[in-house]
Amino acid sequence: MRISQLEGKAVALWGWGREGRAAYRALRARLPTQALTVFCNAEEAREIGALADAALQVETDASAQALGRFEIVVKSPGISPYRAEALAAAAQGTHFIGGTALWFAEHAQADGSVPGVVCITGTKGKSTTTALLAHVLRAAGHRTALVGNIGQPLLEVLAPQPPPAYWAVELSSYQTGDVGRSGARPQLALVLNLFPEHLDWHGDEARYVRDKLSLVTEGRPRIALLNAADPLLAGLQLPDSQVRWFNQPAGWHLRGEVVYRGEQAIFDTADVPLPGEHNRRNLCAVLAAVEALGLDAAALAPAAASFRPLPNRLQLLGSVDGISYVNDSISTTPHASLAALACFARRRVALLVGGHDRGLDWHDFAQQMAQQAPLEIVTMGANGPRIHALLAPLAEAGHFGLHAANDLEHAMGLARNALGEQGGVVLLSPGAPSFGAYSDYVARGRHFAQLAGFDPAAISAIDGLGVH
């Protein structure tokens, strides 16, 4: 559905975060007199009132009855379509659509194809991979957009001039379904990995996997690039797409610190500023994507050495009094915390874990701690007591020191004291979202930086967003 098709219809926007505001501006630019209603909270309603838009109404009760009055509801990604009020309104005939679907419909050609668009998703690593892809494409001299879930809503860059040659688009599991619903077919879709996350939004693991994979099952990209090492992807059948693989011996894969293409050694990653084996494997994905676009990936591989790592992702802030502080606030699953820990296997580490409780299973994490644990673990947040109880028997057996904190500031003090004069690494890799304590993971990362004695503003920006 294109924006022009909304004209004259009963249209509402649900959500007034950055995505919601981007949708409003895009609709208003194309449909200046279209009547619109925004569903938002009371504080946001006051902000909207200052816009002085006579064709804009505000409601704060997004009930099924209220939503059901509209033909089209443009929904912000963070609002689950599985909420009872959304399902009830849909049953009454309301059509829910996201800004991502509108953008793809605007850019699709007559046959549905969207040339130059690379969509990237995965449970973890998608932001770094998307940014790295944009970096490599720009190094090759191509004007490239870095947009999507990484921090720039697609509707904020609806029609940039001159248009980019390539679009590196990060999509969360909240957005992947929009691609198929738009009727568009991206040139390439890359799926990095899959393990449970956002179960509160999706409802259960099976639905999460289905929604995530809808990018390739319903979006029908011209080329689907998949991780051969992921068991949830390895058997996937996609008859409408050309399927390519990375992380397998015949293609782009990692041996030690060296990237190979088949049996040919291509690039030593020792100087690439991407900590962790998982990040080096994602470099293989980027090079496979570059190759799939018809470019010389082997020649472009060295460009990765000049990539600047993203904030809040295994970000080394610096050292104070013999203690290094690493900000991995983006970590919102136990698997992500394990991957972060693996980067510091030979260091004295105090790990800070815990946050909003989404009901994820921490038993695998606990089993790993029994085999290769950090020196100290500090639990915090709403799920902190649950994690603490799970780890307590291992701590009592002498595998690691275990501490319970009331909040991040308390956790920092406990971690410093536990490391003592010998120093080490304080690693914030919570394995849980920040909801309830912070507005988002960025705010949590900034607070961590501040508590560690660093300027939070100086470490928070993502380089290269938008079209360059």
Swiss-Prot record:
EC number(s) on file: 6.3.2.53
Class of this enzyme: ligase
Catalytic activity: UDP-N-acetyl-alpha-D-muramoyl-L-alanine + L-glutamate + ATP = UDP-N-acetyl-alpha-D-muramoyl-L-alanyl-L-glutamate + ADP + phosphate + H(+)
Molecular function (Gene Ontology), one example: ATP binding
Pathways involved: Cell wall biogenesis; peptidoglycan biosynthesis
Xref: Gene3D superfamilies: Mur ligase, C-terminal domain, Mur-like, catalytic domain, NAD(P)-binding Rossmann-like Domain
Pfam families, sorted: Mur_ligase_M
Entry-linked InterPro entries: Folylpolyglutamate_synth_CS (IPR018109), Mur-like_cat_sf (IPR036565), Mur_ligase_C_dom_sf (IPR036615), Mur_ligase_cen (IPR013221), MurD (IPR005762), MurD2 (IPR043687)
Binding site for ATP: G122, T123, K124, G125, K126, S127, T128
SUPFAM superfamilies found in the cross-reference section: MurD-like peptide ligases, catalytic domain, MurD-like peptide ligases, peptide-binding domain
Keyword Kinase: no
Compartments, record wording: Cytoplasm
Main location: cytoplasm
Gene Ontology biological-process entries: cell division; cell wall organization; peptidoglycan biosynthetic process; regulation of cell shape
Keywords: ATP-binding, Cell cycle, Cell division, Cell shape, Cell wall biogenesis/degradation, Cytoplasm, Ligase, Nucleotide-binding, Peptidoglycan synthesis
A single cellular component GO annotation: cytoplasm
Biological function: Cell wall formation. Catalyzes the addition of L-glutamate to the nucleotide precursor UDP-N-acetylmuramoyl-L-alanine.
Family according to the record: Belongs to the MurCDEF family. MurD2 subfamily.
HAMAP family: MurD, MurD2_subfam
Protein name: UDP-N-acetylmuramoyl-L-alanine--L-glutamate ligase
Natural source organism: Xanthomonas axonopodis pv. citri (strain 306)
